[in-house]
A protein has these predicted regions:
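Short alpha-helical transmembrane segments in multi-pass integral membrane proteins
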Residues: 1-24, 84-151, 189
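Residue-level signal for short hydrophobic patches within transmembrane helices
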Residues: 17-36, 40, 65-72, 148, ...
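Residue-level recognition of transmembrane alpha-helices
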Residues: 24, 31, 60-63, 107, ...
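Hydrophobic/aromatic residues within transmembrane alpha-helices of membrane transport systems
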Residues: 29, 41-45, 59, 84, ...
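Interfacial/gating helices of multi-pass transporter permease domains
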Residues: 45-67, 134-138
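Small-residue-rich hydrophobic transmembrane alpha-helices
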Residues: 56-116, 153-172
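Alpha-helical transmembrane segments of multi-pass membrane transporters
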Residues: 118, 171-189
């Protein structure tokens, strides 16, 4: 049965300048926009009446843990994206699809293990990252919400890398912008 999929061919034929604009500009916009996640969270949390400063301190304590989670999801995704890019260049779509399936499975497993481990040891982890008796409640409340959606976060960061490396940097940027807007809308709820 012949393959009907096509791989982006501009990587082998377009000039470096054009490719740089096509891939780097959406990447820069997406990375800049993704920094808004924590800024928007900080704005809403900082305005909590009576406890804004403690809540902001609790939020700041969670950043290293959230960065570690993001790094693990991205690690799996970038590794798979690299393999998929090579396979698409070779027009080996069957193996590329297997790598994609393995990436999804591995990111689900890693995300779930990370979530379970963190929920089991959340207080000691937060103390390790600088929580105090005054900020622990806020850090725990925020991090528990983040951890319950952690598998989705792992999948998002992993699949976003694959989308970008498969020749769709604008789609990857659009997904990032969508999640930033969604986060901004859902934060007050």
């Amino acid at each position: 049965m012949p393959q009907t999929q096509t791989a982006p061919t501009e990587l082998g034929s377009e000039s470096i300048g054009i490719l740089l604009k096509k891939y780097a500009v959406p990447g820069i916009i997406a990375m800049t926009a993704s920094s808004l996640y924590n800024m928007v969270d900080s704005i809403y949390i900082g305005h909590i009446p009576g406890s804004g400063s403690l809540a902001i301190s609790g939020l700041a304590v969670t950043f290293p843990l959230m960065n570690l989670s993001t790094a693990l999801g991205t690690l799996v995704g970038v590794g798979a994206a690299t393999m998929i890019s090579v396979l698409l260049g070779q027009r080996n779509y069957k193996i590329a699809n297997k790598v994609l399936a393995n990436e999804v499975t591995l990111n689900c497993i890693v995300g779930l293990l990370f979530t379970v481990f963190c929920l089991m040891f959340l207080d000691p982890i937060l103390y390790f990252f600088g929580a105090s008796a005054n900020t622990l409640k806020y850090a725990r409340d925020y991090m528990e919400i983040i951890l319950y959606g952690n598998v989705i976060t792992h999948l998002y960061f992993g699949l976003n890398s694959i989308i970008r490396s498969s020749g769709n940097p604008k789609m990857a940027m659009g997904l990032t912008l969508f999640t930033v807007i969604l986060n901004s809308i859902l934060d007050p709820i």
